[in-house]
């Protein structure tokens, strides 16, 4: 499992810093204007008595293009080759089809261009609600955490809920809490299996819980204005986070953990063929893996000297420790879980395996 930020204290300090530095606005798109110079696109926001200016981040560029109906490949070409045309296109469509949008900014940068009904489930509040629950769960410990440009992650294992896949090969139950403040996915609580022998984490999609960022529509006004937490919103969020606390407290489920362990054991009996290079190429095409990821998986697949489906799953999750980006590392852990489920289910349908009955 890839290690992110060093300590929970470091994580909390960064979340507090971001809380102070961020600014969220609701703006009529007619009050917005972009201007691109020397490869940098700035967006200005008229608030009535002032004009605020922010540099567009990469995610905001993509969200802006999508909302305005500009094909992203063409958007990027204008951005690189004809920035004046980009500005004309964006400013024209912002004015022609006016609507309210939420602008999320941090450190002078527009990081998200979202619906005005987007519910702000902030990372600091999430951590404040989730960490006390984790601390009260017997044997639970945060073993990896990070805050990236797009997501917050807390990866937790329960040291008391463990079993052997085969003698000497121990796995522990756990879960992952993740959240995006910029519209790149729901707040999720996903089951995790942690293999001690190689420190691999595998995320299962089967029993994941999701909470979506959909909230109330904001008031109607022509001028942009800053969003603050009001008492009604705070009350709504309290109820919401109480539900999240309930999900987290029940995230380590022994019956579901045992079902995943049974699938891991079943995967040991599934052969992947006689050509590991071809096996990894097929895998790479199916899950859109880049050359470095394919090379890493192949290396671990061969070094593990286990060419069963179980060995392939472990090669994928082990490769997550080799990538630089924490988001991508987590996605490879999810791919490992999906690969396990699909391989075992496919073998069972062909009559090659008999799966245990669901709990």
Q: What function would you assign to each model-found segment?
A:
Residues 116-141:
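Amphipathic alpha-helical segments
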Residues 49, 111, 115, 139-141, ...:
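Sparse, context-dependent recognition of short Cys/His-centered cofactor- or disulfide-binding micro-motifs
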Residues 94-117:
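A short, surface-exposed helix-loop junction/capping segment
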Residues 51, 55, 113-121:
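Generic amphipathic alpha-helical segments used as scaffolds and interaction surfaces in large
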Residues 151:
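Extracellular structured ligand-interaction cores
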Residues 1-88, 144, 148, 159-359:
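Intrinsically disordered, low-complexity regions enriched in serine/threonine
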């Amino acid at each position: 499992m890839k290690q992110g930020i060093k300590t929970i204290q470091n994580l909390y300090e960064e979340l507090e810093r971001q809380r102070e530095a961020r600014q969220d606005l609701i703006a009529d798109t007619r009050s917005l204007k972009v201007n691109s110079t020397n490869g940098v696109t700035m967006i200005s926001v008229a608030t009535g008595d002032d004009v605020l200016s922010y540099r567009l981040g990469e995610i905001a560029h993509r969200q802006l293009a999508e909302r305005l109906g500009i094909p992203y490949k063409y958007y990027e070409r204008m951005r690189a080759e004809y920035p004046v045309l980009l500005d004309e296109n964006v400013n024209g469509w912002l004015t022609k089809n006016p609507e309210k949008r939420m602008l999320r900014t941090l450190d002078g940068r527009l990081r998200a261009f979202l619906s005005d009904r987007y519910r702000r489930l902030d990372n600091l509040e999430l951590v404040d609600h989730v960490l006390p629950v984790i601390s009260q769960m017997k044997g639970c410990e945060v073993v990896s955490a990070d805050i990236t440009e797009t997501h917050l992650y807390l990866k937790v294992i329960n040291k008391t809920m463990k079993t052997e896949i085969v003698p000497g090969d121990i796995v522990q139950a756990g879960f992952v809490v993740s959240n995006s403040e910029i519209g790149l996915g729901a707040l999720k609580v996903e089951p995790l299996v942690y293999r001690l022998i190689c420190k691999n984490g595998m995320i299962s999609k089967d029993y994941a819980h999701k909470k979506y960022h959909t909230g109330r529509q904001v008031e109607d006004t022509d001028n942009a204005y800053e969003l603050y937490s009001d008492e009604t919103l705070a009350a709504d969020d309290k109820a919401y986070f109480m539900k999240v606390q309930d999900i987290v407290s029940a995230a380590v489920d022994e019956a579901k953990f045992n079902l995943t362990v049974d699938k891991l054991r079943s995967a040991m009996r599934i052969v992947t063929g006689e050509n590991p290079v071809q096996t990894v190429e097929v895998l790479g095409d199916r899950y859109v893996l880049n050359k470095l990821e394919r090379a890493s998986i192949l290396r671990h697949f061969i070094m593990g000297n286990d060419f069963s489906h179980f060995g392939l799953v472990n090669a994928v999750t082990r490769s997550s420790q080799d990538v630089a980006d924490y988001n991508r590392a987590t996605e490879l852990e999810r791919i490992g879980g999906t690969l396990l489920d699909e391989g075992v289910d496919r073998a069972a349908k062909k009559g090659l395996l008999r799966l245990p009955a669901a709990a």
